[in-house]
């Protein structure tokens, strides 16, 4: 069984039951992605529910007072995320009649949405075959393929994105993207991963070459 199919099979057995995974509605998916930037799932979950309860739709978020949004955000830090969230909701409500762009190309034009978030929403909501590349993906791919490129370099991001696009299941892009991120979050963790219990322990090059703890490689800033 190849990497992609094995990964998806693992995910279907081991995945966490997270509320934003049970929908293709772009609004809660977008909310979850913004909340979870720089934030752990356990910490972000109550905020996700609070925002959905207070603002069930993007239009209701748009008409909210900014101070109300910031108050609900209190404790998460990085308040520019909350301001961008509110401004983007207003743009979608007022300029797009409350309808999210339905493609990566359209989503990435929105304020506060970068390459990763656009890819996540496009694949999870619309099943568009675009790869997500975050810290988890860097780690899984660099270890499995034994890639020692410096992940702080811009060209490395392109290298990993191209490789992730090759691995991506064109039939099930949302499932694959969720699977590779979940694998990095639960199994292929940054420190002391339990490689003896890993589905890839006979094919992972980092394990074979005793480089699990040094990959992915990131140069120290001088």
Predicted regions: what they are:
Residues 3-196, 200-214:
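Catalytic cores of DNA base-excision repair glycosylases
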Residues 217-222:
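Short, intrinsically disordered, charge-balanced linker/junction segments flanking boundaries
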């Amino acid at each position: 069984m190849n990497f992609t199919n094995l990964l998806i099979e693992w995910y279907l057995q081991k995945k966490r039951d997270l509320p934003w995974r049970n929908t293709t509605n772009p609004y809660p998916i977008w909310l979850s992605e913004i909340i979870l930037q720089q934030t752990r799932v356990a910490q972000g979950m109550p905020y996700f529910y609070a925002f959905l309860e207070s603002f069930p739709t993007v239009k209701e978020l748009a008409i909210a007072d900014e101070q109300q949004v910031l108050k609900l955000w209190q404790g998460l830090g990085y308040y520019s995320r909350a301001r961008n969230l509110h401004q983007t909701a207003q743009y979608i409500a007022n300029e797009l009649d409350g309808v999210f762009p339905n493609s990566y190309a359209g989503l990435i034009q929105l304020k506060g949405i970068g390459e990763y978030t656009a890819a996540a929403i496009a694949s999870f909501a619309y099943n568009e075959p675009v790869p997500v590349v975050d810290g988890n993906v860097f780690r899984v791919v660099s270890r499995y393929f034994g890639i020692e490129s410096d992940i702080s370099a811009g060209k490395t991001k392109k290298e990993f994105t191209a490789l992730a696009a090759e691995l991506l299941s064109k039939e099930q892009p949302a499932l694959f993207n969720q699977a590779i991120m979940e694998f990095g979050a639960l199994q292929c963790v940054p420190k002391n991963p339990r490689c003896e219990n890993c589905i890839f322990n006979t094919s992972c090059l980092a394990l074979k070459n005793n480089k699990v703890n040094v990959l992915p490689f990131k140069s120290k800033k001088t």
